[in-house]
UniProtKB/Swiss-Prot annotation:
Adopts an immunoglobulin-like beta-sandwich fold forming a hydrophobic cavity that capture N-terminally myristoylated target peptides. Phe residues within the hydrophobic beta sandwich are required for myristate binding. GO terms for cellular component: cilium. Residues 1-31 are annotated as: Disordered. Keywords: Cilium biogenesis/degradation, Developmental protein, Lipid-binding, Protein transport, Transport. Residues 1-18 have a biased composition (Polar residues). Gene3D superfamilies: GMP phosphodiesterase, delta subunit. Myristoyl-binding protein that acts as a cargo adapter: specifically binds the myristoyl moiety of a subset of N-terminally myristoylated proteins and is required for their localization. Plays a key role in ciliary membrane localization of proteins. Required for the establishment or function of the nervous system. This is Protein unc-119. The keyword Protein transport applies. GO terms for biological process: cilium assembly; lipoprotein transport; nervous system development. One of its GO terms (molecular function) is lipid binding. Tetradecanoate binds at Y110. SUPFAM superfamilies: E set domains (SSF81296).
Amino acid sequence: MKAEQQQSIPPGSATFPSQMPRPPPSTEQGITTESELAKKAQITPNDVLALPGITQGFLCSPSANIYNIEFTKFQIRDLDTEQVLFEIAKPENDQENDESPQESARYVRYRFAPNFLKLKTVGATVEFKVGDIPIHHFRMIERHFFKDRLLKCFDFEFGFCIPNSRNNCEHIYEFPQLSQQLMDDMINNPNETRSDSFYFVDNKLVMHNKADYSYDA
């Protein structure tokens, strides 16, 4: 009896569009709205967890990142096969550039093959550096939506970061099981799968990045 051969997944790609699409606002009653959060002096993890859908814009400006947190490398691998599915790194000659990031730099568009949606568990390794201020209780909440449907919410702790350090860690993503119909819808509607990545220090929002995804590579 021959063992079933596992199909290799082509590596993904990423681009940084100059303009970010604005999804329709969520209109559910009795739930925290994006406009309400925009008026708050401090946004907490509980605030973003109460949002009914993907955000239309950013909930904080780049200047909120007083800790000078900068992500310099990102890699995704399939934990079952150890295959690297995606990798991107900031060029070395750009890492000394101290310019504040523009809005477009916080929005990335990923493109993967259709069978990426069948993965069960992936490891996401990030490398980042921090500035002169020590960081306590560094946390990321990442919410993935297809149109107005919440697919998965990930919640990770980075821990303590000493000043002027370069750090790396791997977070394990356990993907939800998707029906064939939903996978077909996601493949046939590129960039309608979106995510918000919220970064908190001491329960205060300091960074907000966004992404969208297509699965037609």
